[in-house]
Amino acid sequence: MASGPHSTATAAAAASSAAPSAGGSSSGTTTTTTTTTGGILIGDRLYSEVSLTIDHSLIPEERLSPTPSMQDGLDLPSETDLRILGCELIQAAGILLRLPQVAMATGQVLFHRFFYSKSFVKHSFEIVAMACINLASKIEEAPRRIRDVINVFHHLRQLRGKSDQLHLPKPG
């Protein structure tokens, strides 16, 4: 077993002499940061920023503004509250089911996508959240039995102090 500063320096020198590729540059697959432009050099390309805009959304903009829930008479703050509550419910259920975070996030994405095509007025957000966490556990290869999912949601409903599901009043 070689130890000491000399063996470390020799190993570093050997690694740096082996690093140049056939083209003579030392970029290879190593990621380095440049100080002159403030970007990151990956391969031969310089990346300086990440831009997130609505242009890269997975849901078309025309489906974002009048959601089916709004068309059924639900106001925006109530819909936002139901979306937040549904995502919190999925997160809490995922923790109790000991699912990986990626499965919980997948369930939340499925929940949002469902309610961009269906109405909160016509579908129970609790049942949809239950279905989303069940489907997400299968998609992310961390399957849980449906009985376990039902039991966890029943437990969470009892913790919230509700004896029955939330039913929104029908408009009109």
Curated annotation (Swiss-Prot):
GO annotation, biological process: regulation of transcription by RNA polymerase II
Domain of life: Eukaryota
Region (Disordered): 1-36
GO molecular function annotation: cyclin-dependent protein serine/threonine kinase regulator activity
Keyword Iron in annotation: no
One Pfam family from the record: Cyclin_N
Region: Cyclin-like, residue numbers: 88-168
GO cellular component: cyclin-dependent protein kinase holoenzyme complex; nuclear speck
Keywords: Cyclin, Nucleus, Transcription, Transcription regulation
Transport as UniProt keyword: no
Compartment list: Nucleus speckle; Nucleus, Nucleoplasm
Classification via InterPro entries: Cyclin-like_dom (IPR013763), Cyclin-like_sf (IPR036915), Cyclin/Ssn8 (IPR043198), Cyclin_N (IPR006671)
Entry remark concerning the domains of this protein: Contains a RS region (arginine-serine dipeptide repeat) within the C-terminal domain which is the hallmark of the SR family of splicing factors. This region probably plays a role in protein-protein interactions.
Quaternary structure and interacting proteins, as annotated: Interacts with POLR2A via its hyperphosphorylated C-terminal domain (CTD). Interacts with CDK11A, CDK11B, CDK12 and CDK13. May form a ternary complex with CDK11B and casein kinase II (CKII). Interacts with pre-mRNA-splicing factors, including at least SRSF1, SRSF2 and SRSF7/SLU7.
Function as written in the Swiss-Prot or TrEMBL entry: Involved in pre-mRNA splicing. Functions in association with cyclin-dependent kinases (CDKs). May play a role in the regulation of RNA polymerase II (pol II). Inhibited by the CDK-specific inhibitor CDKN1A/p21.
Similarity annotation: Belongs to the cyclin family. Cyclin L subfamily.
Protein name: Cyclin-L1
Gene source species: Pongo abelii (Sumatran orangutan)
